[in-house]
UniProtKB/Swiss-Prot annotation:
The keyword Glycoprotein does not apply. Substrate binds at T57, G73, A74, A75. This is Aspartate 1-decarboxylase. The gene is panD. One of its GO terms (biological process) is alanine biosynthetic process. Keywords: Autocatalytic cleavage, Cytoplasm, Decarboxylase, Lyase, Pantothenate biosynthesis, Pyruvate, Schiff base, Zymogen. Catalyzes the pyruvoyl-dependent decarboxylation of aspartate to produce beta-alanine. The active site is at S25, Y58. The modification Pyruvic acid (Ser) is found at S25.
Amino acid sequence: MKRIFLSAKLHKVTTTAVELNYEGSCEIDGVLLDAAGIGAFEQIQIYNINNGNRFTTYTILGKDNSGIISVNGAAARKVNVGDVLIIAAYALYSEEELEGYAPRLCYVNNKNILTKISTGSKKSSLY
């Protein structure tokens, strides 16, 4: 049996742009995507800390070290520039893969510059 677990999280990134008339997605600084192990065009969940909105979209590779977090298309109606977001990616894991499981947790400063990478603690008896 496979289960869905968090694979990576970008914690408290700040929205730098919203582009309503774009085909969709979320453009994210390439350094942040690499640090989290999230690929271009990978499905992500976005949780808006400011207003509680939660939605699904996919990533677009942004320029390295730009700090860009641009929410585009219809999702732009759920976010304002300056809103603080949690961006999460999930993956399917087999029981065997869960033995070595640890999500990548990436933290940034208020300019979306990476400050820390850690892994989740294993507090559950499930893995």
